Design a protein with these regions (language model features):
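N-terminal signal peptide c-region/cleavage motif recognized by signal peptidases
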Residues: 20-22
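Auxiliary, metal-adjacent structural segments of Zn-dependent hydrolase domains
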Residues: 25-78, 86, 142
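Short pre-active-site segment immediately N-terminal to the catalytic Zn-binding motif
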Residues: 81-98
């Protein structure tokens, strides 16, 4: 009987050790190019390559083609483009990446559902202020940003944990898309209900 108890303890210790082992990131190979070959652009490229090794971004990578461009606004298409902001903050840099990939979720996987999603978002959150910095300056894309920013938050929670993810969202709420991020922070459950109705997920 004591031997069985000891064996059980050993098996439990082994199981805990296996669960605790760091998992190897499985991010697909990213095709990252710099627009001008500038040192700061190369630094941003290296940052993204490092983050792709540190975190498993497979679930959050729809397009693998990434352009790094000084002075550009981050945008998702036709090629996902990241600027040089957040070189000193990995969490914010990572959030910018998953944010732009979130646009690809809507473009590639939910294109046919987008009209109904827009109507539901507009009905659920009427009178959204769309002028910058509250929105992005355009009605439809400001409403779609509610979905994209929620996808961003979900991804960040999975990658860096709820506490750090919330800090990112709170920082962004003070920086840009302030009305959109405020909706997420104050009405998260309602936002998620809308997304669930239309199958918006990673």
């Amino acid at each position: 009987m004591p031997k069985r108890k000891n064996l059980a303890k050993i098996l439990i210790v082994i199981a805990i050790a296996l669960v605790s082992l760091p998992t190897r990131a499985e991010t697909p190979k990213l095709n990252i190019k710099t627009k001008h070959g500038l040192p700061a652009e190369e630094q941003r490229k290296e940052q993204m390559e490092r983050l792709a090794k540190q975190y498993d971004l497979k679930k959050y990578t729809i397009t693998r083609d990434i352009s790094i461009e000084r002075g550009a606004m981050n945008h998702s298409s036709p090629v996902l483009t990241l600027n040089l902001r957040f070189l000193d903050n990995d969490d914010l840099a990572l959030s910018a990446y998953v944010h732009e990939q979130g646009h690809w979720v809507l473009m590639e996987r939910l294109r046919a559902e987008n009209p109904r999603l827009f109507e539901d978002l507009q009905r659920s959150f009427p009178n959204l202020e769309i002028r910058a910095p509250e929105g992005d300056g355009e009605l439809r894309s400001s409403y779609f940003h509610i979905a994209v920013c929620m996808l961003e938050w979900h991804a960040m929670e999975d990658l860096v944990g709820p506490e750090r993810a919330r800090k990112v969202i709170e920082w962004k709420q003070r920086d840009h898309y302030t009305a959109i991020y405020s909706i997420l922070l104050n009405q998260r459950e309602q936002v998620e209900d809308v997304l669930n109705r239309h199958g918006v997920k990673w």
